[in-house]
């Protein structure tokens, strides 16, 4: 069996595409019912769960009403420093050439079945493995060329002495999960986390007899060609 690849690119965070609120050209509508939804929590509800108490605690210490915060989610959305309200990664085992969802007769391939098992185990263990990344949306798509996961998460960092005690911070969330502080652009918390997640996926693959081709960490910072094409279409539809 030829070695397969693990793809773990960053996504652009198009929840409407992920939740199939509209159908792009690369989607096979007849297979959309095959998709597996693990969690779909509204972003606003997730923010209340993650930061609601911290927001109320902060406001309780402010005697002046003009210093109180009304909506932490909107505060991040409206900040001028390009803060992200959430992050997305796409997780894929193989490519359409070696892990196609269906065969010529439209039946689920054996390679796809194995990939689904791996991706499902990854999805179901993500939160336990990443306690400071709150998973609020996770879906496996089987209505495109290759099985893949979309994972959406909110980074949670604790222990701030000024302002809200708990906040959205990807760097600090990684640090509080034990990843060392960055020493360069190529040696930082995000890269270390990506490496760990890819190692876990590699272990899951090898347990099922799949060899993995190592392509290097920089591949994780690139979008899959199929995904890039979909995102261009999504952006056009949302304009």
Per-region residue spans from a language model:
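N-terminal nicking endonuclease/strand-transfer module with a His-rich metal-binding environment
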Residues: 1-239
């Amino acid at each position: 069996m030829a070695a397969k690849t693990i793809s773990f690119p960053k996504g652009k965070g198009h929840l409407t595409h992920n939740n199939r609120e509209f159908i792009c050209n690369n989607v096979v509508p007849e297979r959309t019912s095959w998709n597996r939804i693990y969690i779909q929590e509204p972003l606003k509800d997730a923010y209340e769960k993650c930061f609601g108490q911290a927001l109320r605690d902060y406001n309780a210490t402010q005697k002046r009403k003009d210093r109180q915060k009304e909506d932490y989610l909107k505060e991040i959305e409206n900040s001028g420093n390009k803060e992200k309200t959430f992050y997305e990664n796409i997780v894929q085992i193989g490519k359409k050439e070696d892990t196609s969802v269906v065969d010529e007769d439209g039946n689920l391939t054996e390679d796809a079945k194995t990939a689904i098992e791996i991706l499902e185990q990854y999805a179901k263990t993500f939160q336990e493995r990443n306690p400071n990344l709150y998973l609020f949306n996770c879906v496996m798509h089987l209505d495109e060329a290759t099985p893949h996961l979309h994972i959406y998460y909110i980074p949670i960092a604790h222990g701030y002495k000024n302002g809200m005690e708990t906040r959205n911070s990807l760097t600090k969330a990684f640090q509080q999960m034990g990843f060392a502080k960055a020493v360069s652009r190529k040696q930082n918390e995000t890269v270390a986390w990506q490496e760990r997640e890819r190692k876990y996926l590699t272990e899951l693959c090898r347990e099922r007899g799949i060899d993995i081709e190592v392509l290097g960490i920089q591949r994780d910072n690139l979008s899959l060609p199929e995904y890039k094409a979909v995102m261009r279409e999504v952006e056009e539809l949302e304009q």
